Swiss-Prot record:
<protein>
    <recommendedName>
        <fullName>Uncharacterized protein DDB_G0289357</fullName>
    </recommendedName>
</protein>
<keyword id="KW-1133">Transmembrane helix</keyword>
<feature type="compositionally biased region" description="Low complexity">
    <location>
        <begin position="7"/>
        <end position="25"/>
    </location>
</feature>
<feature type="compositionally biased region" description="Low complexity">
    <location>
        <begin position="425"/>
        <end position="525"/>
    </location>
</feature>
<feature type="compositionally biased region" description="Low complexity">
    <location>
        <begin position="292"/>
        <end position="322"/>
    </location>
</feature>
<feature type="region of interest" description="Disordered">
    <location>
        <begin position="80"/>
        <end position="243"/>
    </location>
</feature>
<feature type="region of interest" description="Disordered">
    <location>
        <begin position="422"/>
        <end position="525"/>
    </location>
</feature>
<feature type="compositionally biased region" description="Acidic residues">
    <location>
        <begin position="182"/>
        <end position="192"/>
    </location>
</feature>
<feature type="compositionally biased region" description="Acidic residues">
    <location>
        <begin position="30"/>
        <end position="40"/>
    </location>
</feature>
<keyword id="KW-0812">Transmembrane</keyword>
<dbReference type="GO" id="GO:0016020">
    <property type="term" value="C:membrane"/>
</dbReference>
<feature type="region of interest" description="Disordered">
    <location>
        <begin position="363"/>
        <end position="391"/>
    </location>
</feature>
<feature type="compositionally biased region" description="Low complexity">
    <location>
        <begin position="80"/>
        <end position="133"/>
    </location>
</feature>
<feature type="compositionally biased region" description="Low complexity">
    <location>
        <begin position="164"/>
        <end position="181"/>
    </location>
</feature>
<feature type="region of interest" description="Disordered">
    <location>
        <begin position="278"/>
        <end position="324"/>
    </location>
</feature>
<feature type="compositionally biased region" description="Polar residues">
    <location>
        <begin position="227"/>
        <end position="243"/>
    </location>
</feature>
<feature type="region of interest" description="Disordered">
    <location>
        <begin position="1"/>
        <end position="40"/>
    </location>
</feature>
Length: 556
């Protein structure tokens, strides 16, 4: 501060001597004095307003005096004449001086003997070295804070020479005009409108996702781009970055991420959106845009590039043929669907409409059913070329053998059914005639399946295996039924997978069929005789019991 300022603040010459001594001992740092509270408050006002400046206002703009945005913008004016300083100093002052300004900048704190307030307010304050700039005399108490807060910061810093020392008087005149307006308009609210309005302006800062400016009030949104561009050029030599500059970088990053091709169009669109949704006259409303800018810019990209993209909300798909479906079908371009795209299901075409909610077992069952249907459809189509048929369905030969075996088993079961012997013999004769007339049909496959066992064993041996259960059937009726059916199935199923020795197949099959049929007829005849014998035996036992009881009664 200058000597005239100290005299107006009722400081003594002892204070000057102390400052000189402290400068010699401690460099540019000043030790606190009990009588220097007013000076320290003024220095703090100067530092706070210069380090916590959030707006870079254009001088050519004319705003309404009714809004507190315009008052704050006028108060923080004179940014072109400020002294640039280092980035580390600015950051330190932002965090050191800002918490203490509310306690120290109290107009009722006039006690110069209060050592605690002086010591707490004067820590870290820089005193000038060398020449000192002249300043006008101090006005009243209410105007001192405002005037000194908007003064030249070169009074507190002398490390770097100010390039704009010639414009000090002009800036001081502007500050006087601006201060008078602020005091007249804000007398009804609080004595320090800058602090209260700054705190109010910081309240709407709710989220960092929106790229709009958080703490700089936008009075005329039409000139927002010019404000943001002008904020880049205010203090080029200083390492400090203003809030508007940082917020512009955030907005540019969001726009670049969302728009790879049209950066300029989307930046203009972002400002137009904010113009539509922000009202400068509404003091309580936040300057954030209501619409999420990321979603709107993606949709506009789609309109500009004429590309349809698949998102969670859209219903059109492009090039999703790689997604697997049960029937190996794919989507067509521009086709509307109602199910989840990732699963790749069209409920109208798939048999199970709720396949996305089915379990793994249900899905595997459905896949097996579809495969079986495809195999049956391929079977129903006659193919003259056996090679192609085998290539399409490698299990076709085995399936034919299984069908032939099933037909043979059914025939054997019919023979074992309780029918008269004449009808059985007629069935046997019919089967023999069919085998003689159609040796190349199903019986041929049966014979081919039985050729292996017949080639390895003698004919007598096969007949003995077929006739063997007749000896045991005379003892028990139930076992004879089971053994006869088991033997007939055994002679057919044990040789199901053989494909060799086709030359002896017809003869061996005829022999084996005849032996099995004769064995079954003998079994059925023995069953009828056994039942008759059993009935006679039971009748004789009853007669014996009755006679025995009758003799006992006679003896008594």
């Amino acid at each position: 501060m200058s000597n005239s300022d100290k005299n107006n603040n009722n400081n003594t010459n002892n204070n000057n001597n102390n400052n000189n001594n402290n400068n010699g001992n401690f460099g540019i740092w000043e030790e606190p004095d009990d009588d220097s509270t007013n000076e320290n408050e003024e220095l703090f006002n100067n530092l706070i307003t210069k380090t916590t400046k959030f707006i870079d206002d254009d001088e050519e703009e004319e705003e309404e005096e009714s809004s507190w945005d315009t008052l704050y913008a006028k108060h923080v004016e004179t940014s072109n004449t400020t002294q640039p300083f280092n980035n580390s100093n600015s950051n330190n002052n932002n965090f050191q001086t800002q918490p203490t300004n509310i306690s120290t900048l109290n107009p009722n704190n006039n006690n110069s003997n209060n050592s605690s307030s002086g010591s707490s307010s004067s820590r870290g304050v820089r005193t000038p070295r060398g020449t000192r700039s002249n300043s006008p005399p101090q006005p009243s108490k209410n105007e001192t804070v405002q005037k000194e807060s908007s003064g030249d910061i070169s009074e507190g810093f002398t490390l770097i020479d100010s390039p704009n020392d010639n414009n000090d008087n002009k800036n001081n005149n502007k500050n006087n005009n601006n201060d008078s307006n602020i005091v007249d308009d804000d007398e009804d609210e609080e004595e320090f409108p800058t602090l209260s309005k700054k705190n109010q302006k910081r309240k709407p800062k709710k989220s960092t996702s929106s790229p709009s400016s958080t703490s700089s009030p936008i009075v005329s949104p039409q000139t927002q781009t010019s404000k943001l561009e002008s904020s880049m050029d205010v203090s080029p030599s200083s390492g400090k970055q203003s809030w508007s500059e940082l917020l512009k970088n955030v907005a540019d990053e969001d726009i670049n991420n969302n728009n790879n091709n049209n950066n300029n169009n989307n930046s203009n669109q972002y400002h137009q959106e904010e113009e539509n949704y922000y009202d400068s006259d509404d003091y309580d409303s936040s300057p954030f845009a209501i619409i999420n800018n990321s979603s709107t810019t993606t949709n506009n990209n789609n309109n500009n590039n004429n590309n349809t993209t698949t998102t969670t909300t859209t219903t059109t798909t492009t090039n999703s043929s790689s997604l697997p479906i049960v029937n190996s079908q794919s989507f067509e371009e521009g086709e509307e669907i109602t199910s989840d795209i990732k699963i790749g299901i069209k409920p109208k075409t798939v048999t199970v409409p709720f396949q996305s909610t089915l379990s793994l077992r249900a899905r595997t069952k459905q896949i097996k059913k579809v495969q079986q249907q495809q195999q049956q459809s391929s079977k129903s189509k006659p193919n003259n070329n056996n090679n192609k048929f085998v290539d399409n369905n490698p299990y076709a030969v085995l399936e034919e053998e299984e069908r032939a075996l099933q037909s043979a088993i059914k025939a054997s079961l019919l023979l074992n059914s309780p029918v008269d012997l004449d009808s059985k013999q007629q069935n046997v004769s019919q089967q023999k005639q069919q085998q003689e007339q159609q040796p190349t049909t199903t019986t041929n496959s049966v014979s081919s399946s039985k050729s292996k066992s017949v080639a390895t064993t003698d004919k007598n041996r096969t007949t003995s295996t077929a006739v063997a259960p007749t000896t045991s059937s005379n003892k028990k009726a139930n076992k004879s039924n089971k053994t006869s059916t088991a033997n007939t199935t055994a002679t057919t199923t044990t040789t199901a997978s053989s494909k060799k020795n086709k030359s002896n197949s017809n003869k061996s099959s005829n022999v084996s069929n005849t032996t099995t049929t004769t064995s079954t007829t003998e079994n059925s005849a023995s069953e009828g005789s056994f039942i008759k014998n059993a009935v006679i035996f039971i009748f004789i036992l009853l007669l014996m019991v009755v006679g025995f009881k009758y003799t006992q009664t006679l003896n008594q």
